[in-house]
Amino acid sequence: MSETQPAKPAAPRRDQPRTHHGDTVTDPYAWLKDPEDPATVDYLKAENAYTESRTAHLAGLRKAIFNEIKGRTQETDLSVPVRKRGWWYYGRTEEGKQYGIQCRLKADGDTPPEIEAGTAVDGEEILVDGNALAEGHDFFSLGTCDVSPDGNLLAYAVNYSGDERFTLRFKDLRTGED
């Protein structure tokens, strides 16, 4: 007995000219950029239904691959500390949390601190906690982070929309205020 498979969807072309710096480009699929347009939603639902129907037989394999990758991923981890202007800077991740945490620790000589993943570090200063910044947002990406030469200000970039346009923020590391 064969099941009826959905037809392969084809996005209709709707030529939409756009002029930038005197050059006009016509994008026949620009209408798909609007996530609120019912036509976009309907098309994506059709794409998803088609893909699901064509790959349903792979569900077990998908789950096995996911579990293998997850099993090989060390969720609680940390980067190698880097010494800069009297501080050790490093990033760490924690199991069950999606985003990294950028930290620093006052340097006591040239020997890196003994930091163990998943263990609290005395004197650690959290510069940016991606998990806290992402809270309440559907999307989050942390861009660059850099500390001023005197170690008192942090410049970091965040993106909450996924459009790759980051907002530059500043944090006073003496007070913790943005």
Sequence positions of predicted segments:
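Beta-propeller folds
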Residues: M1-D178
